[in-house]
Design a protein with these regions (language model features):
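Hydrophobic core of transmembrane alpha-helices in multi-pass small-molecule transporters
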Residues: 10, 78, 90-105, 206, ...
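Extracytoplasmic gate region of multi-pass secondary transporters
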Residues: 19-24, 196-249, 253
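Intracellular juxtamembrane helix-capping segments at the cytosolic ends
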Residues: 26, 104-118, 300-313
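Interfacial helix-cap and linker-helix signal at transmembrane-aqueous boundaries
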Residues: 26-27, 58-59, 137-151, 156, ...
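Central cavity-lining transmembrane alpha-helices of secondary-active solute carriers
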Residues: 42-57, 238-250
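Conserved MFS/SLC helix-loop-helix module at the cytosolic interface between two early adjacent transmembrane helices
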Residues: 50-88, 255-261
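Helix-loop-helix hairpin linking two adjacent transmembrane segments in secondary transporters
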Residues: 128-176
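C-terminal transmembrane helical hairpin of 12-TM major facilitator-type secondary transporters
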Residues: 212, 238-244, 249-250, 255-308
């Protein structure tokens, strides 16, 4: 189950986070502004975040296999159709809906499956599973950049459509519904979502998402405008992914022995401080340092989000709870990259846009500080089972 989840997330997010490699070719072909082009990625994130509660509920009710298989077909169709668009706004529909739905169908059901199958070492298993996102990020952008340079962006999307569909269908065939003996929730689903702890998680996640997706869209073009080659620019997104693998696996394993909420807060702090490095990054080596630090914090955030939900609320209906939390990412993503693009277009500089992302990331950490008071009592130490 862990291997299937790892591979599924690698395929889904490898496609989604490769968008930065397609950004400049599409910007040039359609003659659009940065904000309008980046909206294609933002819509993708909004769709996968908004569909999280739906795919989580469907997985809880009907099992993950049919949900993941459906996502495979939808993602493949969306990518294939994107290769044929002649207007940018059509990409909002084909790429935004297709890739967004595919990611939603892969991520939440797979995370819920791993959380349900494991009791002991649950956090380690979750950390390994979501490390697939980082591995996909490592591979996706550089592979896309190399393919685009030889085949063009349209043919590359066709290749991605075929590969992602085949991989996700294989993962769907392997995955099985977890046993029914999951840890029961302390409170009812509606009460959990309305609780102060969940509200803090949600607000913090909105703010961090505003910052998080900015480098995935703009870091390659930022590096290119500062003298880096196309491949070296795209490789920065891969470095973020590589560092996030270490963050996901390392912190996921450490959470089995340390306080999961405090590690979660530390991940947000590291992520926030990394934007200060980017703000002072006129040279490629400093950009690499930013990518490494940001990736480590990002990896901890992604790896520990499911663990924090299980820790605070139990694993009963975990897919639905995670889906509800992940809608926050959609709101943040819809604001972050388009706003950054608008600022860059208006000022002709990345500096103010990076500073705005820095401020949003700091705010996300501040919002998370009170979360420690809501740690569960010792009778249900879910994260340490």
């Amino acid at each position: 189950m862990v291997a299937a989840a790892f591979v599924a997330m690698c395929a889904a997010y490898g496609v989604a986070y490769s968008f930065g490699a397609f950004f400049k070719p599409m910007l040039a072909e359609f003659g659009a502004r940065r904000g309008a082009t980046s909206a294609m990625f933002s819509i993708t994130v909004l769709v996968w975040a908004s569909l999280g509660p739906v795919t989580g509920h469907l997985s809880d009710r009907f099992g993950p296999r049919v949900v993941v298989a459906t996502g495979a077909l939808v993602m493949g169709a969306g990518l294939a159709l994107t290769s044929m668009i002649d207007r940018l706004w059509l990409g909002y529909l084909t790429y935004g809906l297709g890739v967004g739905a595919g990611v939603a169908c892969a991520y939440v059901p797979m995370v819920a499956v791993v959380g349900g199958w494991f009791i002991r070492r649950r956090n380690t298993a979750l950390g390994i599973a979501v490390a697939g996102i980082g591995f996909g990020t490592v591979c996706g952008a550089p592979v896309a950049a190399a393919s685009i340079s030889h085949l063009g962006w349209r043919a590359t999307y066709v290749a991605f459509a075929i590969a992602s569909t085949a991989i996700l269908l294989g993962c769907a065939w392997i995955v099985e519904r977890p046993p029914v003996h999951v840890t029961p929730s302390r409170i009812q689903l509606g009460d959990a979502i309305r609780s102060p702890a969940f509200r803090l998680l949600y607000a913090s996640s909105v703010m961090v998402a505003m910052a998080l997706f900015v480098p995935f869209v703009y870091l390659p073009s930022f590096a290119h405008e500062h003298g880096a080659s196309d491949f070296a620019s795209a490789a920065l997104v891969g470095i973020i992914g590589g560092a996030s693998v270490a963050g996901r696996m390392g912190l996921g394993s450490l959470a089995d022995r340390a306080g999961v909420v405090r590690l979660y807060q530390a991940s947000f702090l590291v992520l926030a401080l990394s934007y200060g490095i980017w703000l002072a990054a006129p040279s490629y080596p400093v950009m690499v340092v930013f990518a490494l630090v940001m990736g480590a914090g990002y990896g901890g955030y992604v790896a520990l989000s499911p663990a924090v939900i299980a820790h605070l609320f139990g694993t009963d209906r975990m897919g639905t709870m995670l889906g509800a939390l992940y809608t926050s990412g959609g709101f943040g993503a819809m604001a972050g990259p388009p706003l950054a693009g608008l600022i860059i277009d208006r000022t002709g500089s990345y500096r103010v846009a990076i500073a705005a992302a820095f401020a949003a990331a700091i705010a996300s950490f501040v919002l998370l500080i009170p979360l420690t008071r809501y740690e569960p009592a010792s009778e249900l130490q879910i994260a340490r089972d």
